[in-house]
Curated annotation (Swiss-Prot):
Any one of the GO CC terms: plasma membrane
Name of the protein in its database record: Capsule polysaccharide export inner-membrane protein BexC
The keyword Transport appears for this protein: yes
Stored InterPro entries: Bact_polysacc_biosynth/exp, BexC_CtrB_KpsE_VexD
Coiled coil: none
Function: May form an ATP-driven capsule polysaccharide export apparatus, in association with the BexA, BexB and BexD proteins.
Main location: membrane
Keywords per UniProt: Capsule biogenesis/degradation, Cell inner membrane, Cell membrane, Membrane, Polysaccharide transport, Sugar transport, Transmembrane, Transmembrane helix, Transport
Family of the protein in this entry: Belongs to the BexC/CtrB/KpsE family.
Transmembrane segments: 23-43, 351-371
Record carries keyword NADP: no
Top-level taxonomic group: Bacteria
Organism for this UniProt entry: Haemophilus influenzae
């Protein structure tokens, strides 16, 4: 009786182990065997070409440390925002199109490598979008947030091809920086040039208004002309005083002197002329005083326009110099490498990782099955 009771758990244990064997083989043995065969025999070598660069700008007043201080000691500081711009550009479709114009990228990635690693190994999707997604996975651009240094890594099936892609990407990044420089310089200088054009237009308009006013009012030198008119009035008044004095003497001595009527006519004529000259000088809307105010207003407007033009031209010269000084530069710190050893795939690591993941999956499924059976019982 005791022997029979002891045999029952043994049979149950064997039955349980038999049921678990297919699950263990499915989750652990088969994936591990496939991983060992693939990574041990078929997986193609992948070479990683690496380079590093930094985008720098003329030195600012900010204080930096490390590599930033090193760049400042040479007169430049890092420009991290623009480094991120280069990073995004290198991983963009635009950069891929530029690369394909000079390198046979599809040939690099579709005619070499094993079926699982190469592009479109099973001939299912040969579109440009599929190739872009594939190439994006073979490219990495990491930026150090502290130093601002970017590291570019290109994964390829051939060391020389990876080197060529890396080198070409650096040139494309430099071209991007040059385009950004040119665009910023063009926009800045165009704004300053437009200010000069506006100032020149204002000078021409005020000068034309002043010229038309001079022609209309027959003014060539208003201060000199006003001075002549004042001198004329002064002379007329002196002449009037002389005539009045002479007339008074004649009237007191010989009232019937025939010169008296002539002097009286002369006196009347001088007074009329003095009144007319005085009226022209300051008596009506077209007087010299009014003309002087209008003339001075036009002269002031013209002088201000000339000053604005001079300031705009000075600003344009300064802007050109500043635009030249604010150029960005892509400085290559380490040139693209041409590796002689395939860093990928990590064959042993991948096999062990497959085994461990299979064990974890097996354990989870085992617990799940046991829980379901216990629930049914």
């Amino acid at each position: 009786m005791t022997t029979e009771n002891a045999a029952i758990p043994t049979k149950k244990k064997k039955s349980f182990w038999k049921k678990m064997k297919p699950l263990f083989g499915l989750t652990v043995l088969i994936p591990t065997a496939f991983s060992a065969v693939y990574f041990g025999l078929f997986a193609s070598d992948i070479y990683v070409s690496e380079s590093s660069f930094v985008v720098r700008s003329p030195r600012s007043q900010s204080s930096l440390s490390g590599v930033g201080a090193l760049l400042q000691s040479t007169g430049f500081s890092r420009s991290q925002d623009d480094t991120y711009s280069v990073q995004e550009y290198m991983r963009s479709r635009t950069a891929l199109s530029a690369l394909e114009q000079g390198l046979p990228l599809r040939t690099f990635y579709s005619e070499k490598g094993d079926l699982l690693s190469r592009f479109n190994g099973f001939g299912l999707n040969d579109t440009q979008e599929a190739f872009y997604r594939y190439f994006k996975e073979r490219l990495s651009v990491d930026v150090d947030s502290i130093s601002g240094i970017a590291t570019l890594r290109v994964h390829a099936f051939d060391a020389e091809e990876g080197y060529q892609i890396n080198e070409r990407l650096l040139k494309e990044g430099e071209s991007l920086i040059n385009r950004l420089n040119e665009r910023a310089r063009k926009d800045t200088i165009e704004f300053a040039e437009q200010a000069v054009k506006d100032a020149e237009k204002n000078v021409n308009e005020t000068a034309q208004a002043l010229s038309q006013y001079r022609i209309k009012n027959k003014i060539f030198d208003l201060p000199a002309q006003s001075g002549v008119q004042l001198s004329l009035i002064s002379s007329l008044k002196s002449e009037l005083i002389r005539v009045e004095t002479q007339l008074a003497q004649l009237v007191s001595i010989t009232p019937d002197n025939p010169q008296v009527p002539a002097l009286q006519m002369r006196q009347k004529s001088l007074k009329k002329e003095i009144d007319e000259q005085t009226r022209q000088l300051s008596g009506n809307g077209n007087s010299a005083a009014t003309q002087t105010a209008d003339y001075q207003r036009l002269m002031l407007a013209n002088e201000l326009a000339q000053q604005q033009l001079a300031a705009a031209m000075t600003s344009l010269q300064n802007t050109r110099g500043e635009a030249d000084r604010q150029q960005l530069y892509l400085e290559v710190i380490s040139q693209p490498s041409k590796p002689d050893w395939a860093l990928e795939p990590s064959r042993i690591y991948n096999i062990i990782a497959t085994f461990i993941i299979g064990l974890m999956l097996y354990g989870v499924l085992n617990l799940l099955i046991a829980s379901i059976r216990e629930h049914k019982n």
